[in-house]
Amino acid sequence: MINILVSTKQSLTEVLGWLEREQTESGEGFFCNESTIVTSHDAGELFCGLADNRVVGFVVHNKKSVGASIDILEVHPQHRSRGFGSQLATNAIGRLFATGAAFVTVQCSPRSSEPFWRSLGFLPQDSYPSRAGEPTHLVLHNVA
């Protein structure tokens, strides 16, 4: 189980540090979205999952006029396959629905993330037909 809290300057620094290392070592990850992550932190839309007082994952989301989107969700490579991503996602979904969002969207990039989001109830978005090589757009409607 992780504690999920709005980011602090310290947790932001920790996230950016491991994303930069991941980019350098593997050429993968979300360090390319550094400015989005910092802007989301400044707007209070970056939430970090902590275990043993260390950031093990984070989620960036934003509320729009009617719906909301989860823009980035990543779990530190050393902490994957422990359910932390599901905890971050369900916490973000609950928070967004509690603010009145009628739906939450995600863009599956990489496409290998699609089964994860579908396991949480997300379905293809009709307004974004899936095309080969492009990210899949999924939506989860608030039925409450």
Show the residue positions of the predicted features.
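Conserved active-site alpha-helix within GNAT-family acetyltransferase domains
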Residues: 110-134
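Active-site rim helix/loop that mediates acceptor-substrate recognition in acyltransferases
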Residues: 22-51
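Conserved beta-strand in the GNAT
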Residues: 48, 54-62, 67-74
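Short alpha-helical
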Residues: 10, 55, 65, 111-112
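Conserved acetyl-CoA-binding loop-helix of GNAT-fold acetyltransferases
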Residues: 75, 81-94, 119
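Active-site beta-strand termini and strand-to-loop segments that position acidic
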Residues: 50-52, 140-143
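Short amphipathic alpha-helix that is part of the acyltransferase structural core
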Residues: 1-31
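Conserved GNAT acetyl-CoA-binding A-motif
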Residues: 96-109
